[in-house]
Structures are given as C-alpha cells and as structure tokens.
C-alpha cells in the first residue's frame, strides 16, 4: 500500500478537492494495485500550496527565484519494501491555470504523479530518461482513467 501525508498549505485547494486526504487514499489504493507497485509499502508527504510558497521553496532548494508547478524532494534512492520516499510540493495556481480548458483533477493527477516518479528516481535530464518517465506517467494516468 502507498500512503500520502497530505498537508493543506493553501485554502484554495479545497475549492477543487473537497477532502484531499480521501482523494489520495482512493488514488493511492488504485495505484497500489498497478503491477509495478504491488507489494510495496511506500509513504510520502505532499504539500498542496500556492505560488508564493513554491517560489520560496524553489529558491531555497534550487536557487531559482521563480515559482514552479511541482517540486520533489527524494529521501533516498535506496528503496526497501517499506520506504519513506520523500516530499512533494504542488502549486495550486499553476495547476488551475493549466487546467483552464480541461479538467483540474486530470492536470493535478498528471503533476503529482510526475512528482511521485521523481521520488522513485525518475528524471528528465536526458531525452532517454525523459521518454522513460513520460511513458510511466502515461501508463499510470491511463490506468487511472481506463473504463472498467
């Protein structure tokens, strides 16, 4: 089972996701049944915040004085069956803006999955690793939204 510790850092999130803890509980239950994640006991924290705090975090940890959609802070890349993976932070304003012509939830899922994969060691520094990460994101998103 995969568990998320959800930290609601900005009130606007509840306009789109009424109960973030239940939302992640349901999504992660489904993700835990995805073949790659079966029999894994992973835990991570996710901060649902705003542009102001994201800009501050981005500067503090990456020395970039601008906001961003998602930041991931892996705890370790040595995974055991039971592992704390690390922390993710996501900006409400960026997700909301990108979702302007589509679904907020689908855009949010895309971004937190991207952050989650960073916790698992995926990156997009080179074309090959970018494609590998993008393929895994798409596999998970398709699994989430497949018709039963």
Where are these regions (language model features)?
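An acidic/histidine-cluster motif and surrounding catalytic segment
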Residues: 1-112, 117-148
């Amino acid at each position: 089972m995969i568990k998320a510790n959800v930290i609601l850092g900005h009130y606007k999130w509840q306009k789109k996701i009424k109960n973030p803890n239940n939302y992640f509980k349901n999504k992660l239950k489904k993700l835990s049944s995805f073949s790659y994640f079966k029999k894994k006991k992973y835990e991570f924290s996710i901060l649902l915040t705003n542009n102001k705090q994201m800009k501050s975090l981005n500067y503090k940890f990456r020395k970039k004085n601008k906001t961003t959609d998602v930041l991931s802070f892996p705890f370790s890349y040595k995974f055991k069956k039971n592992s704390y993976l690390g922390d993710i932070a996501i900006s409400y304003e960026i997700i909301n803006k990108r979702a302007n012509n589509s679904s907020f939830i689908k855009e949010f899922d895309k971004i937190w999955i991207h952050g989650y994969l960073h916790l698992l060691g995926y990156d997009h520094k080179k074309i090959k690793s970018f494609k590998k990460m993008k393929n895994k994101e798409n596999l998970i998103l398709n699994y989430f939204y497949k018709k039963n």
